[in-house]
Amino acid sequence: MKILKLKLYQETACYKKPFATKVAETYPLPPYSTVIGMFHKILQAQPGAYFPMNISVQGNYEGIFSNYQNLRMYKGKDKVTSMPRNVHQLLNVNLIIHVQAEDETIDKIYKNIVNGTETFTLGRNEDLVRINGIKILKDVKEVEDQNIKINAYIPEWIDKEINGINYRLNTTYKIKEDIRQWDKVNVKYVEKYTNESIEEILQDEDGDNIYFYSERIPNGL
């Protein structure tokens, strides 16, 4: 299995929290399900197809602001109403994403990004992504006692005791009776420069930590 590393930039982004209606609150980083969805779009996956993968998400943003958008709501077949909604957005987002998958999957993601002509989004359809860096890692090692250098989601299986903001994030789903049943993972959102450290963690050849959401790639790979 290979690991692909991407450095992404977004001028603005809203990674909307579930069930936020009157106010569209955003996560501080994209949840795993959003990142997995982006990769499946890059892979041109057919409806219902799933490529097993493991994801690490970290990054920083310059600030947060809000604006009003018109929310359309459908009641029944014919009735449509609208209301203004406050949308929280992140400004100048820089992300580091690591994805681990079968060699063929990683090679296809890399090829489709490097040779692709389409624009990519992460979050809403209007949240465009600029890819500032992409490479398949050659050297990943386990290191000890590492500080948090970049804001990150740190899964519970890596460190239960670390201080941070608790989130229960969607990862993948199964459809039961036409309803998506999400698998979830408990994480802490930990900010840089908080004097928090992790005893053992994976680190790539550039010195960036890797916080995969699962000990093993889902589906047993």
Tell where the protein language model's regions lie, with residue ranges.
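Generic beta-strand structural signal
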Residues: 4, 53-55, 93-95
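Internal, well-folded beta-alpha domain core
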Residues: 64-221
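A generic structural signal for short, non-catalytic loop/turn and secondary-structure boundary residues
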Residues: 1, 48-50, 90
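Short, structured patches in soluble enzyme cores that scaffold and shape functional sites
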Residues: 8-10, 59-61, 99-101
